[in-house]
Amino acid sequence: MFKNYREILALPGALRFSMAGLVARMPIAVLGLGIVLFIQGVTGSYGLAGIVAAVYMIVQALTGPVIARLVDRRGQATVMVPIVVTHLIALSLLIVSVYLDWWVGLTFVFAGIGGATVGSVGSLVRSRWSHLVTSPRQLQTAFSWESVADEL
């Protein structure tokens, strides 16, 4: 069993993009909770925290297919590099806006921009596997590996 995983991870670039995908997936699952805990901790308001987190997650759900389509048309690096940079800036500004007690509307704007700039990392990595491997058996093994990575 492990032989098959070693075989696909030995392919050129496979270990690098698979590990990058693993690291990139980690914060996605807990970011909504992190927003709630941070904002509640700073402001004392679960209501504000929940609304800001909801804005982030709803915008993420609405824009995910748009980002996926752009990636399909223009390529991963062309689309994702500016999106990741924008995401980091938006989340940083969200933190600053809450911590420095800026106008709450800006917090919603930064949450929306942060949510709008989240790519589907699992899909991006699986797409790379589809282009890298040559046999259906290897592809099945690669997707199995990615399923395990999704659960970590």
List where the protein language model places each region.
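Hydrophobic core of transmembrane alpha-helices in multi-pass small-molecule transporters
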Residues: 22, 103-121
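Helix-loop boundary and gating motifs at the non-cytosolic
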Residues: 2-61
